[in-house]
């Protein structure tokens, strides 16, 4: 469904809005995304967000070379076999994603009168979602060739004025 349309069908305000891994890469417009978040937050409400760092989306699937821009210059279009839920499904399809730099994420939220309370970056992911991940500590995974040199995930908390 179209998250941008949610304010047209849901008429509630919340103390917390939470968005997690793998969400904004499917969205072309973070300004509209931030409008939706602000729309549903009560004054003083908190937006909690955790996402893969845009740095990791710059690489090819095997993390051997940079393939895409860090900046949202154009949609990323790839051909994928299978589906998100079933990689062995007999299906070939194009999918479109966008790589949003962290500055775009933060600035879109600030433009909607949300105040940034915290921002953190992590050199690991809490689960093995990329090819060739290795668990270096219980519940912490890294892309071996990147190690702890680059961020894998980031999180933030923002509060609505």
What are these model-derived regions, one by one?
Residues 31-46:
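A short glycine-rich, Lys/Arg-flanked "PGG" loop and its adjoining helix->strand segment in the class I
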Residues 4-17:
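A short acidic, Gly/Pro-enriched loop at the edge of an enzyme's catalytic core
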Residues 46-83:
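Conserved class I S-adenosyl-L-methionine
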Residues 15-31:
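A short SAM/SAH-binding and catalytic strip from SAM-dependent methyltransferases
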Residues 112-114, 139-161:
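Core SAM-dependent methyltransferase catalytic element
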Residues 1:
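Cofactor-binding loops of NAD(P)H-dependent oxidoreductases
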Residues 54-62, 89-104:
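Acceptor-substrate binding/catalytic loop of class I
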Residues 95-119:
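Short alpha-helix
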């Amino acid at each position: 469904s179209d998250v941008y349309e949610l304010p047209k069908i849901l008429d509630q305000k919340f103390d917390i809005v939470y968005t997690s891994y793998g969400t904004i890469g499917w969205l072309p417009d973070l300004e509209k995304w931030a409008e939706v978040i602000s729309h549903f937050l009560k004054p003083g409400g908190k937006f909690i967000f955790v996402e893969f760092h845009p740095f990791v989306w710059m690489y090819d699937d095997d993390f051997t070379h940079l393939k895409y821009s860090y900046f949202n210059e154009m949609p990323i279009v790839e051909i994928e076999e299978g589906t998100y839920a079933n990689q062995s499904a007999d299906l070939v399809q194009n999918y479109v994603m966008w790589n949003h730099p962290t500055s775009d994420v933060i600035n879109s939220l600030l433009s909607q009168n949300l105040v940034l309370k915290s921002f953190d970056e992590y050199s690991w992911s809490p689960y093995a979602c990329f090819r060739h991940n290795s668990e270096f500590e219980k519940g912490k995974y890294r892309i071996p060739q990147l190690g702890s040199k680059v961020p894998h995930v980031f999180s933030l908390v923002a509060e609505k004025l």
